[in-house]
Swiss-Prot record:
Keywords: Host membrane, Membrane, Transmembrane, Transmembrane helix. It comes from Psittacid herpesvirus 1 (isolate Amazon parrot/-/97-0001/1997) (PsHV-1). This is Membrane protein UL43. One of its GO terms (cellular component) is membrane. The lineage of its organism: Viruses, Duplodnaviria, Heunggongvirae, Peploviricota, Herviviricetes. The gene is UL43. Belongs to the alphaherpesvirinae HHV-1 UL43 family.
Length: 508
């Protein structure tokens, strides 16, 4: 009797479970048609059954009512699982996963692996794109902040791309790039006003020293020193110019791009024409291309471009600002023009007189750029027509004119700093030197007297003229027409220094 009751007691749960299966099957036709159906153990098992079991044709689909709930539950849960580990191990560890049929387990694992693979691929692509953008932005920002590096690299590419260039040119280019970078980074760490003054004075003086070294008979050591001085001077000038401008990154990048275009145009044209010049002329050619930025130190063509009204309007429209500069751009700082000698450059910048527009018009700047570029355009034309005999004569003379102009600019700014308190002495000296300079120019044009004395006097005259023109140009009490007169004086000095008596020595 006891054994019989025990058998009945054990049979009751099985009957109850079977009845529950029948009731569940009657409520869900999909479960009724699935022979591999097992008792419910977890919500995950129900989800996989609803998701991967195909509906029976002709019968209502039980998934239509609860599929959205299952999707929401699964999306939340699997998102949490993927955030924690992102692997299929958690899928295998879900309650009731092992109780699922093999077909459902395999398909679910494959689906999860495919999802994880797509997610990892998209994540790696996003990381690669983000890393590339960060590197590109850092590189562009670095070039924008130190855009003189573009010019130095352009020089090296131009030197290394020609087979005719001597080996010392390539070696010196790499060596001088490192020297120029170190010097410029040191300058960037110091005060901006001091950097600007040092760059304006040191770059032309270094180029003048390079020209003096050219008079020494060429040897390996002298050639390296020449290239080092030239590239260091260019780097110093550009570092000071970039720090002084205080422009937005887009403007700095535009300035660097303009210089890159100009320099690569000159260098690539020389390579394409493939002129077989002598070593002395090659050195002069290197110096000529290295001095182009320094001769036009006060009149940067890229700065002229971004100072035009059209460019400023486009930048303001792009950024939605009223001023394209990060802060108000400083005018040329001349101590002699200060009323209060103890005022700094920042305090002088806040002067109410500065509210006047001190920028020249874009048309006048374009004319000045064209006038400055005339002698270099002549060199380009000579390269294009392949007149080697003329190039042998023109390049050294124009190189000498560039050195003279660089020395004149340097001396002019030095006079501005030293004679700030005695402007009348400067004006009187300019008048005296004007008479002497016109006499020297007349002698040079008549080929009566072309000696080193003429070079010295012409350089001093150019320096005085530049100093006087800059004084007029920067005086806020003068009208705009008078300021343009100062601009004209500076341009005239540069033209006389660059292509004065040198053009008279060309032999056709």
């Amino acid at each position: 009797m006891t054994a019989r009751l025990r058998s009945v007691r054990h049979a009751l749960p099985r009957m109850t479970t079977k009845s529950r299966q029948i009731s569940a099957a009657s409520a869900n036709p999909i479960r009724a048609n699935n022979k591999e159906f097992l008792p419910q153990t977890s919500p995950a098992r129900n989800y996989f059954l609803f998701l991967f079991t195909p509906p029976v044709p002709g019968k209502p689909d039980a998934r239509s009512g609860i599929i959205s709930i299952a999707n929401r539950w699964t999306a939340t849960r699997y998102t949490r699982y993927r955030e924690h580990s992102g692997s299929t191990k958690l899928l295998r560890s879900l309650p009731g996963f092992r109780d699922l049929p093999d077909r459902i387990r395999t398909s679910s694992l494959a689906e999860m692996q495919r999802t994880e693979l797509e997610a990892s691929e998209s994540k790696s692509i996003r990381r690669a794109c983000l890393s590339g953008l960060v590197v590109a932005y850092a590189f562009v920002a670095w070039l924008a902040y130190l855009n003189y590096v573009i010019v130095v690299v352009a020089h090296i590419i131009g030197y290394a791309s020609t087979v005719l260039a001597p080996r010392w040119v390539r070696a010196a280019g790499v060596l001088f790039t490192l020297c120029a970078l170190c010097a410029s980074l040191l300058l960037c760490r110091s005060n901006a006003a001091r950097v600007h003054a040092v760059g304006k004075l040191a770059a032309p003086l270094l180029l003048t020293a390079a020209a003096a070294l050219c008079l020494v008979p060429l040897c390996a050591g002298v050639s390296v020193v020449i290239a080092m001085v030239v590239l260091t001077a260019v780097a110093i000038f550009f570092s000071s110019a970039v720090i002084c401008h205080q422009m937005r990154p887009l403007l700095r990048m535009s300035q660097g791009a303009v210089w890159l275009f100009l320099d690569m145009l000159l260098l690539d044209l020389a390579v394409m024409v493939n002129l077989k010049l002598s070593e002395q002329t090659s050195v002069q050619l290197i110096m000529l291309f290295g001095m182009v930025p320094t001769v036009m130190a006060s009149f940067d063509p890229a700065a002229m471009l971004i100072d035009t009204t059209m460019f400023k309007r486009q930048v303001c429209a792009k950024f939605g600002t009223a001023e394209p500069y990060v802060c108000a751009q400083r005018r040329i700082y001349i101590p002699g023009l200060q009323i209060d000698k103890n005022k700094s450059a920042d305090a002088w910048q806040e002067d109410p007189m500065q509210e006047r527009d001190s920028q020249l018009t874009g048309e006048t700047l374009k004319l000045g750029t064209a006038a400055c570029a005339c002698p270099f355009s002549v060199v380009l034309v000579l390269f294009a027509v392949d007149y080697k005999c003329i190039v042998e004569t023109v390049v050294p003379t124009l190189g000498l004119g560039c050195v003279q102009a660089a020395a004149g600019v340097s001396l002019g700014f030095t006079l501005l700093e030293l004679t700030g308190r005695n402007r009348y002495i400067l004006i009187a000296a300019c008048g005296v030197m004007s008479l002497a300079a016109f006499a020297c120019v007349a002698c040079a044009l008549l080929s009566v007297l072309v000696t080193s004395v003429v070079l010295i006097i012409g350089t001093i005259f150019g320096a005085m003229l530049i100093a006087h023109g800059m004084t007029i140009l920067n005086d806020p009490r003068r009208a705009d027409d008078e300021r343009q007169l100062g601009f004209f004086l500076v341009m005239l000095a540069l033209l006389l220094l660059t292509c004065g008596h040198q053009l008279t020595t060309i032999r056709y």
